[in-house]
Swiss-Prot record:
It comes from Legionella pneumophila (strain Corby). Residues 83-107 are annotated as: Disordered. This is UPF0229 protein LPC_3097. Residues 91-100 have a biased composition (Gly residues). Pfam families: DUF444. Belongs to the UPF0229 family.
């Protein structure tokens, strides 16, 4: 019998190669559409696909066709209305338009619309972050473990005895050991009953059968009801498992020195952190805190796009952060992560208080604190006090970001797996 081996990498989708060629050819137009889509999305919706619209004029390809000039004489077969030399007026046509009213002239064409998959969308969105291909598919994760049942075993502690399986094992053993004697007992009893029905039975045969019956009964009775070899114990193993829930605090400085470019870098960093956490936890909650001289909890829209601004007092955000944790997210039930983005500016007298808040109140409650400073490397007082916090707490990490291309290398450094 013949067999066909298909080594094509299209996974049953015959248009995969054409689709990839299309994405490469119109990459600039698609990336522009992706960037516009990201601006309209929530952080929690960033890992979904997207419907992309490209103007028809942008995907126009040059083609060979007959020119409009010159003199052409044509006689069509079966024509009885025209003869050679007759001039036929070109028919008019309606122009395509985007409005609701029809046009009285010209031609038009609809925009080209197609769906980007989740993988294609993320590939294009994170391309300028210089993500390694393997890391795009699976970010490094810090696993927790849980104990799960993995069948039964013949050894263990009394607390783990599986009574049902042990009794089934004992029943099977008793049946296996007693069955031969029960069979011979039944045969002996039937033979004894047959001999007793005779007029003159042989007394020696009767005595022998009675002794055999007594022997078989004793053998059956000596089979123990349960033995140590019958015992079965529940077997449990430790397997990697995501913790049930986590909360991610996004803290951002919105003072006058944080322009839109810096806020865009911060948003991309927060998106990466959110995607990292969703791979490790079943339930993620987001808390957005923005601050200048004062801090407040806001929704995502206000967090990124509000025009409120002012000076810089970082401690106001840390105080609010601590208050929210104490009120809503007990560390015993939540894995708490904090990501703070700032340009490093802070009122000098406030920085020591920030250090005190972090060291004495906040850091003991957290799973991880990641601080990114978005500016060239001339650091101020906030960076200096944060370095002292980093020396005391290994779960405090801080890095500097100069431009968009630095986001992922910094993220990888902050969240890489720690070797023992």
């Amino acid at each position: 019998m013949s067999q066909l081996i298909d080594r094509r990498q299209n996974a049953g989708k015959k248009s995969t190669v054409n689709r990839q060629r299309f994405l490469r050819r119109y990459k600039s137009q698609i990336k522009k559409a992706v960037s516009e889509a990201v601006g309209k999305r929530s952080i929690t919706e960033i890992d979904q696909g997207e419907q992309i619209t490209i103007p028809a004029k942008d995907i126009y390809e040059p083609q060979f066709h007959r020119g409009h000039g010159g003199h052409i004489e044509r006689v069509l077969p079966g024509n009885d209305n025209f003869i050679a030399g007759d001039r036929i007026k070109r028919p008019g046509g309606g122009a395509g338009g985007a409005g609701g009213n029809a046009s009285d002239s010209g031609e038009g064409e609809d925009n080209f619309v197609f769906e980007l998959s989740r993988e294609e969308f993320l590939e294009l969105y994170f391309e300028d972050l210089e993500l390694p291909d393997l890391v795009k598919k699976e970010l490094a994760r810090i696993s927790t473990y849980k104990t799960v049942r993995a069948g039964v075993t013949t050894s263990g502690i009394p607390n783990n005895i599986n009574v049902l399986r042990s009794m089934k094992q004992a029943t099977g053993r008793r049946v296996a050991l007693a069955s031969p004697y029960k069979k011979r007992l039944k045969e002996a009893e039937e033979e004894l009953e047959r001999l007793k029905q005779l007029t003159n039975p042989d007394k020696i045969d009767l005595l022998k059968l009675e002794r055999d019956i007594e022997f078989f009964k004793k053998k059956i009775q000596t089979v123990p009801f349960i033995d140590t070899i019958d015992l079965r114990y529940n077997h449990r193993v430790r397997v990697p498992s995501p913790s049930t829930q986590a909360v991610m605090f996004c803290v951002m400085d919105v003072s006058g020195s944080m322009d839109e470019a810096k806020k865009d870098i911060a948003k991309r960093f927060f998106i990466l952190l959110y995607m990292f956490l969703t791979k490790n936890y079943e339930k993620i909650e987001l808390v957005f805190i923005r601050h200048h001289t004062s801090a407040k909890e806001v929704n995502e829209e206000e967090f990124f796009y509000s025009r409120e601004t002012g000076g810089t007092v970082v401690s106001s955000a840390l105080e609010l952060l601590n208050t929210i944790i104490e009120a809503r997210y007990p560390p015993q039930a939540w894995n708490i992560y904090v990501a703070q983005a700032s340009d490093g500016d802070n009122w000098n007298a406030d920085s020591p208080y920030c250090q005190e808040l972090l060291q004495e109140k906040i850091m003991p409650l957290l799973q991880y604190f990641a601080y990114i400073e978005i500016m060239p490397r001339h650091h101020q007082s906030l960076w200096e006090v944060y370095q002292q916090v980093k020396e005391r707490y290994p779960n405090f990490a801080m890095e500097n970001i100069d431009n968009v291309a630095d986001i992922y290398p910094v993220f990888r450094e902050l969240f890489k797996r720690k070797t023992v």
